[in-house]
From Swiss-Prot:
Domain of life: Viruses
Location in the cell: Host cytoplasm; Host nucleus
Role of this protein: Plays a major role in the induction and maintenance of cellular transformation. E6 associates with host UBE3A/E6-AP ubiquitin-protein ligase and modulates its activity. Protects host keratinocytes from apoptosis by mediating the degradation of host BAK1. May also inhibit host immune response.
Taxonomic path: Viruses, Monodnaviria, Shotokuvirae, Cossaviricota, Papovaviricetes
Gene Ontology BP terms: DNA-templated transcription; regulation of DNA-templated transcription; symbiont-mediated perturbation of host apoptosis; symbiont-mediated perturbation of host ubiquitin-like protein modification; symbiont-mediated suppression of host innate immune response; symbiont-mediated suppression of host type I interferon-mediated signaling pathway
Alphabetically ordered keywords of this record: Activator, DNA-binding, Early protein, Host cytoplasm, Host nucleus, Host-virus interaction, Inhibition of host innate immune response by virus, Metal-binding, Modulation of host cell apoptosis by virus, Transcription, Transcription regulation, Viral immunoevasion, Zinc, Zinc-finger
Stated name of the protein: Protein E6
Alphabetized GO MF terms: DNA binding; zinc ion binding
Keyword Chloroplast: no
Quaternary structure and partners: Forms homodimers. Interacts with ubiquitin-protein ligase UBE3A/E6-AP; this interaction stimulates UBE3A ubiquitin activity. Interacts with host BAK1.
Zinc finger (unnamed) stretch: 25-61, 98-134
HAMAP family (alphabetical): HPV_E6
One Pfam family of this chain: E6
Length: 138
């Protein structure tokens, strides 16, 4: 059987409820809270398997990682729909993650950025924008 890649798959595989999953963070080794377990799947992260052990990423480490990548590996900025030309793909096909929390943006979030002429950033050859949740606190 293939190894689970999502928290809900791991819980199902172990035949336990999600709130009983003890998932260490790959970066700080602290255990993810129940809220972070739910956010992990919502943000479309994948579990990391090392030597038969499974790891995730807590919210604090995701924020730190996003900040580190942005400050050290930022490449360019495009405004709104210009992203289609730079990426040579349709907006629906372009993978964009949140610049702040690393959540994978859905189509409505990407279209909203385009409609409001907000910025997309290319960081480490991957596209970033600000998700609806982080835009509220921005």
């Amino acid at each position: 059987m293939a190894r689970p890649v999502k928290v809900c798959e791991l819980a199902h595989h172990l035949n336990i409820p999600i709130w009983e999953v003890l998932l260490p963070c790959n970066f700080c080794t602290g255990f993810l809270t129940y809220q972070e377990l739910l956010e992990f799947d919502y943000k479309d992260f994948n579990l990391l398997w090392k030597d038969g052990f499974v790891f995730g990423c807590c919210a604090a480490c995701a924020y730190r990682s996003a900040y580190h990548e942005f400050t050290n590996y930022h490449q360019e900025i495009v405004v709104g729909i210009e992203i289609e030309g730079r990426a040579a793909a349709n907006i629906a096909e372009i993978v964009v993650r949140c610049l702040i929390c690393l959540k994978r943006l859905d189509l409505l979030e990407k279209l909203d950025i385009c409609a409001q002429h907000r910025e997309f950033h290319r960081v480490r050859n991957r596209w970033k924008g600000v998700c609806r949740h982080c835009r509220v606190i921005e």
